[in-house]
Amino acid sequence: VVEKAELGGVCLNWGCIPTKALLKSAQVYNYLKHAADYGVSLEGTATADLPAMVTRSRGVAEGMSKGIQFLLKKNKIDHLAGFGKVKPGKKVEVTDASGAVTEFEASHIIIATGARSRELPNLKQDGKKIIGYREAMTLPVKPKSMVVVGSGAIGSEFAHFYNSIGVQVTLVEFLPNIVPIEDEEVSKQLERSFKKAGMKIMTSSSVESVEMAGDTCKVSIKTPKSVEVVECDIVLSAVDIATNLEGIGLEETGIKKKKG
């Protein structure tokens, strides 16, 4: 197994697993806010500690990554830390952190290089005010407000998480329904739930531009009726993902991409 970063890949380290850990923290916080509804009395008021939630989420991911490392060792599977590149003749070139290159040969090669946040031309990520999903998992301070662009699985999960811990969230979707690949009745029900929780939903809308005014993001959003400017602390771009296929030797070996 050739891996340049953490074992377990994107899903385990920067996707499904740590996201679900954050959502669990939000769920527990919500339970505590409504403890009396369950016949539970609390002294004081529950507060959402985002840094502590992030620490727990990262700990869950790191623990599972170490579990992958243990399983590889237990099953006598070699782990090569470095960047892999496919070469003609069923060979793989691995460059480690020091720059040393080692070549391996195999009868079968599996390419599973994961994905990253896709950037829109008019929504360039700076990692601080306009962010992708990785930064959304590790924000050091809870923002007061956030615009989430894209309502697929990634956008909807983060919108729900941040809304649940007290952030004013606006969810922007280009298509007529949020979570557009789901059945329409599912989309409508989720939209009702989000609105009931205090989230602002803008469908059939697109972000035209983001301008900075000090620490405030001024997001120009084109709606079916006009252009609306929404001010927020953070813009999360969650429109799509891009595959990590650059520089791994596909062109040199004649391997064609499909939907990549």
Model-derived segments and their meaning:
Residues G127-K142, I234-G260:
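FAD-site-proximal beta/loop scaffold in flavoenzymes
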Residues K4-A5, V149-G152:
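Glycine-rich Rossmann-fold phosphate-binding loop(s) that bind the pyrophosphate
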Residues S98-H108, K225-I234, L245:
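Core beta-strand elements of the Rossmann-like FAD/NAD(P) dinucleotide-binding domain
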Residues T55, I111-A112, V148, S237-A238, ...:
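Redox-cofactor binding/interface segments in oxidoreductases and associated redox assembly factors
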Residues K4-K142, T170, L175-V179, E185-V186, ...:
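Glycine-rich flavin
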Residues V1, V147-V148, L171:
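Hydrophobic Val/Ile/Leu positions in short beta-strands of Rossmann-like dinucleotide-binding domains
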Residues G155-S156:
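N-terminal Rossmann-fold NAD(P) dinucleotide-binding loop
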Residues A159-S164:
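Gly/Ala-rich phosphate-binding loop of Rossmann-like dinucleotide-binding domains
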